[in-house]
Amino acid sequence: MKITPIAFESLGVRSQATLIETKDLRVLVDPAISLAPRRYNLPPHQREVDRLTELAKVLVDVAKDVDVIIVSHYHYDHHDPGYVIPTDIYKNKLVFIKDPQNMINNSQKYRRAPRFLRSIKDKPSKIEIADGKTLELGHTTISFSPAVPHGADERLGYVIQVAISDKDSTVIFTSDIEGAPKDVHLKFTKEKMPKTIIIDGPLSYLLGRVLKEEELEKSIRNMEEIVKNGLETVIIDHHVLRDINYAEVLKPVYDIAKDLGVRVTTAAEYLNLEPLILEARRKELFKEDNRPARIPRGLANLLSAGEG
């Protein structure tokens, strides 16, 4: 099995786009890329825009040769109705989606999911609701969790986690569980016993606003439990990498992983690259170069559509 992170915060954008390849299947999870519309009360910097453009091209190129596309929920850094990533990537693909009607918040149920489904209409070879299902495609098994909360607050909606297994190993893609602040977030991992997990980490950059101290502490404790679950590799990236002090936030997890011989890494480091932290450094980027960014129309429309 080969795991290739395509776009993540440690690669300079908001995304969790991941390619997972087994001997007989190529699966693309959450093919979307976004930026924070505002951070430190600043719009995206030109370096962020350039990086998004670069990775969008990579993502579109990767999508040409995949068999399966999975959409874990309807936030714009996980799905795209055509703002930045053209919907032609779904042509002739087997597409698994988060249930657009059940266990979903109102903004996704009544606006985002319907718009997305209209945008890809008649393009996939098949669209299937994935929540709670398991299927075998060749020698590959794909399992989906029932919908679980998008972090500690159900108002942000629900996501599905994904487990992909071949004869040799299993990888879990947690989607946006925000570092697992609820015990229900752990159930799927304990059931599937993966060798590798891709997890987003807590919203520590919003501590005191969206995230409570006790929720952060619970997330860290539960991530420690995940590390103890027989894992070999933990890719922690996405929400927590929006915090410039992410390594300090994750120190308890790193410490336990070191004791157990588990590799904990960002998506960039997994690819043997230095993390390219842009959003968390936006203030610094504008100090270096304060010219307004040239934002393409599609990205401008995406940014005006709102966060998440």
Curated annotation (Swiss-Prot):
It comes from the Archaea. SUPFAM superfamilies: Metallo-hydrolase/oxidoreductase. Pfam families: Lactamase_B (PF00753). Belongs to the UPF0282 family. PANTHER family: UPF0173 METAL-DEPENDENT HYDROLASE MJ1163-RELATED, UPF0282 PROTEIN MJ1629. This is UPF0282 protein LS215_2281.
